[in-house]
From Swiss-Prot:
Protein name as catalogued: Pantothenate synthetase
One Pfam entry name: Pantoate_ligase
Gene Ontology cellular-component terms listed: cytosol
Enzyme class label: ligase
Organism the protein comes from: Xylella fastidiosa (strain M12)
CDD domains assigned: PanC
Positions with a binding annotation for (R)-pantoate: Q62, Q156
Length: 281
């Protein structure tokens, strides 16, 4: 049975006991409203560790002033049942006061330069600063051997890996594959914001990513591929933030060179819902 923990001292006691037994510990950080994509991360963690802690914390410092912090879906009972079903050992539910004892305005903040400034960083200033700050705190609270993050938030994964290297956290970072609906739409907690009419339209993002990958692998000029992707998404009713081809480290590729490993990334709005997705190749 899953152990739900809200006290930091108790969490540290549990983890210390596991350590005394020589057990490996994994952390799966989440913001709740969990779906099959999240649960796949827990199952991946179980392959690499003896015990799994999953945190649920809707982190206020990674939301911008006009984003959906207040209305972000919170489903604690369903989250607990789902985590228990996939073998999570501890559900860590910290309060805002536990995570930010001095308040969110006075807290120490972490920032990873360069990779945090592009793509999502352009459209969501301060987002990765909030992500790095809360993830570093979770690392210090749980002291895991391994931590698992979803590849749907690909830039977040790259940023966290850089932070771990720069700050010498002795933690292995794993990326879990994107879990998709039957029509290719990447599973996301924000999909529930889509109307019945918008839901079929949303799958066009994945089809566009496939077209981008195929065009690049056939020798297409990256700027042309990106421009066509924007046209395609706009024709499907999206307001596009970006549709780009990048190297796997998010560096910009050189035209005329077929890159592998590479990645196509899209962020676009359908009505009031902002969706992100990517496709590695």
């Amino acid at each position: 049975m899953i152990d739900t923990v809200t006290d930091l001292s108790r969490l540290r006691g549990i983890v210390a006991d596991w350590r005394r037994q020589g057990l490996r510990v994994a952390l799966v950080p989440t913001m709740g409203n969990l779906h099959a994509g999240h649960f796949s991360l827990v199952m991946l963690a179980r392959h690499y560790a003896d015990r799994v802690v999953s945190s649920v914390f809707v982190n206020p410092t990674q939301f911008g002033p006009h984003e959906d912090f207040q209305r972000y879906p919170r489903t604690p009972e369903a989250d607990m049942r789902g985590l228990e079903n996939v073998g999570c050992d501890v559900l860590w539910l910290p309060s805002v006061e536990t995570m930010y004892p001095l308040g969110t305005e006075r807290t120490v903040r972490l920032f990873v330069p360069c990779v945090s400034d592009v793509l999502e960083g352009t459209f969501r200033p301060g987002h990765f600063e909030g992500v790095c700050t809360v993830v570093a705190r979770l690392f210090n609270q749980v002291l895991p051997d391994v931590a698992v993050f979803g590849k749907k938030d690909y830039q977040q994964l790259v940023v966290i890996r850089q932070m771990v290297v720069d700050l010498a956290f002795p933690i292995e970072i794993l990326g879990g594959c994107i879990v998709r609906e039957s029509d290719g739409l990447a599973m996301s907690s924000r999909n529930q914001y889509l109307s019945m009419q918008q839901r079929p339209q949303a799958a066009e993002i994945h089809r566009t990513l496939i077209a981008m990958r195929d065009a690049v692998m056939s020798g297409g000029v990256h700027a042309d591929v990106e421009a066509e992707a924007v046209r395609r998404l706009e024709a499907a009713g999206f307001q596009v933030d970006y549709a780009v081809i990048r190297l796997s480290d998010l560096g910009e590729p050189i035209d005329g060179i077929v890159i592998s490993p590479g990645i196509a990334l899209v962020a676009a709005r359908l009505g009031n819902t902002r969706l992100i997705d990517n496709l590695e190749f």
